[in-house]
Amino acid sequence: NLYQFKNMIQCANRGSRHWLAYADYGCYCGWGGSGTPVDELDRCCKTHDDCYTEAGK
């Protein structure tokens, strides 16, 4: 959910940018996702997305 996304981003970037700046970041941060993550933060978003996919099964 959005609250978890906010907490994940704040933890990952140590407050260097506002969490909403990542709502459409890379390939996986924000709605949906596909392709190869562009960096560690994007990989973190992919892991989060994958977890939600598995939980929904």
Swiss-Prot record:
Binds 1 Ca(2+) ion. One of its GO terms (molecular function) is phospholipid binding. One of its GO terms (biological process) is lipid catabolic process. It is found in: Secreted. Ca(2+) binds at residues 28, 30, 32, 49. Keywords: Calcium, Disulfide bond, Hemostasis impairing toxin, Hydrolase, Lipid degradation, Lipid metabolism, Metal-binding, Platelet aggregation inhibiting toxin, Secreted, Toxin. Disulfide bonds join 29-45. Expressed by the venom gland. InterPro entries: PLipase_A2, PLipase_A2_dom, PLipase_A2_dom_sf, PLipase_A2_His_AS. Its cofactor is Ca(2+). Its EC number is 3.1.1.4. The active site is at 48. GO terms for cellular component: extracellular region. It is an enzyme of class 3 (hydrolase). It comes from the Eukaryota. Coiled coil: none annotated. It catalyses: a 1,2-diacyl-sn-glycero-3-phosphocholine + H2O = a 1-acyl-sn-glycero-3-phosphocholine + a fatty acid + H(+). Belongs to the phospholipase A2 family. Group I subfamily. D49 sub-subfamily. Snake venom phospholipase A2 (PLA2) that inhibits collagen-induced platelet aggregation. In terms of inhibition of platelet aggregation, superbin b is more potent as superbin c, and d. PLA2 catalyzes the calcium-dependent hydrolysis of the 2-acyl groups in 3-sn-phosphoglycerides. This is Phospholipase A2 superbin b. It comes from Austrelaps superbus. The lineage of its organism: Eukaryota, Metazoa, Chordata, Craniata, Vertebrata.
